[in-house]
Amino acid sequence: MEAEESRAQPPGPGSAGWDLGDTARLRHFLCFGCEGSAYRVKEHKLGFDSAEALLRMIEEGRGCEVVEEIKAFSQEGRAARQEPLLFALAVCSQCSDAKTKQAAFKAVPEVCCIPTHLFTFIQFKKDLKEGMKCGMWGRALRKAVADWYNGKNGMTLALAVTKYKQRSGWSHKDLLRLSHLKPASEGIAIVTKYITKGWKDVQEAYKEKAVSAETEKLLKYLEAVEKVKCTKDELEVIHLIEEYGLVREHLLTNHLKSKEVWKALLKEMPISVLLRNLGKLTANSVLEPRGSEVAIVCEKLRNEKLLKKGRIHPFHILVALETYKVGHGNRGKLWWRPDEDILEALDASFYKAFKTLEPTRKRFVVAVDVSASMTQKVLGSVLSASTVAAVMCMVVARTEKDSQIVAFSHEMVPCPVTADMTLPQVLVKMYEIPVGTTDCSLPMIWAQKTQTAADVFIVFTDNETFAGNTPPAVALTEYREKMGIPAKLVVCGMTSHNFTIAGPDDRGML
């Protein structure tokens, strides 16, 4: 990505902006699910009409390049959603170019990290085949699916298939039947027999066989998965969780009514799952004041290694904190009294999470709307627009050494956010600034006037933008020409349903 952008030439005088070529459009699609410069949070159905650049690149013989982009986005975690990657891979796997198809099928195990991804990929292929006379289960797909299963060891596969059983109308049994899989190892053979024939057949086949320690461990694990489905004994469920690492997806609904079962799950619960369930765990009295479980939760939340491993962003923590602080769920069905120790741990965790962020080493100018309307809630969130803007200012101030933070007042004025400030302190500084109109062209005009070098301009507003004499796209183009910097502009309308400022054909605007 860097190489291509560094080769790009600045637009000539009078041009509308940086051309949004097919590679850039493809990257937009892989990241956001749409090719243009407007990204909307609401999900929409993916189809050929939203992936025209992808189709053009395949037609031009650049299909293998597309597959490499898909792999890069998947492996580096650059996509906002996984579905566009899986859709694009499905399209590549069904095109007429043999090399592209081969590359796409070979990439399936790399892009489909968990069974859910594999099921979604298969469903996209089925959708793309609608109206076509030929079947989709040719030799190449059968091999790709077989390689997905055979590429794992027995224990890893057992964990995956018992946790993610089915999705998008597909199950593991379906895929094994249609792929004609030949197990590459004894472990895979055991798991596939378990899926297709059931535990009793596995038990019968191995009851008198001498097996390795690894196979013994696998058989014990599958036995535990089966046992937990049949038992009503709370102590046995807890033992199976602790002994074999069973997770919530392995348990029956009735098991999850038990406080003690939740306490057992809590010990090895990933931090991302914990953040989503704090309210429920408190409401069900699993987390009680000064209890040992509260201590476990607080220790996890303050653990920087766990935050980094779980790729937890400060926003994840803040949303969990604000949701937990309110004391009830979105629909009001679940109520709880927030635990003070957990609130303190969440607050500490919020600031620790900034340390896990990687700097981009770009030069940023962040411009913030400080009007009263920024107190509105962001669409689908518990956070206000001003809080989101403040956190993003903190992210930039703490991770990017070369950054400027400004606010829309009577003119662009400095917003004094420093790396050591807390969120309340940042919000106070924002509230102290006299309100001005939110003209999205002003950051570029200000930067050009003050000779401020910037690679990225980001504007945070709610829904209100004032159209001044110079459109933002023109101001950005003029800045690029005068400063000789291929700068980009991102305008984030946080309470808007239909917000379009970015030039539709400028790959440097979003």
Identify the role of each PLM range.
Residues 1-383, 401-510:
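Long lumenal/extracellular ectodomains of secretory and single-pass membrane proteins
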Residues 387-404:
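Metal-dependent nuclease catalytic cores in nucleic-acid-processing enzymes
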